[in-house]
């Protein structure tokens, strides 16, 4: 859904900026620095999840104006909020994956993510064939996405259990000041992300406003 894609702009490029900032301390085994960056990253992503939920709830007020044609508006709201929940939840789990990706050890979690993805797709196909229920399809999307991220995070926690605690005696304010370059990079990346969304994702929203969902899908 392009409307959910719009909400993802709230990510601001935090993941890219943090991932870039991890390369140098990882290469020099500066685990205290890495731990501080990950605490900051967790703080940012939790706030982004909250912002997406709030903005998503607000934008839902405009769904009747964005959807044309004969559509069950109640079902549209249910599907929309399920997608919104799926989007928000991902920010509570995926920040740890940035660490292992920056450390070039993504292969250690690929098994969990790929296996749950394959099982999810098979289960969704079976459900669609038997029930023709899009609601259950989205529900499976959320459940298996969460399962994959939880398993991946357990592996990441085990991988860095002796070095990364995600805890510090420092306050978030101090950690921000010590890593001011991350905020600067986030600002630079945000405008590129916004431009990319405007160019590639607004078409479907505009088509749905002036046409209907069937033509939007085509």
Regions found by a protein language model. Name each.
Residues 54-65, 70-93, 110, 114, ...:
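Alpha-helical transmembrane segments of multi-pass membrane proteins
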Residues 42-70, 122-129, 150:
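Alpha-helical transmembrane segments of multi-pass membrane transport and lipid-handling proteins
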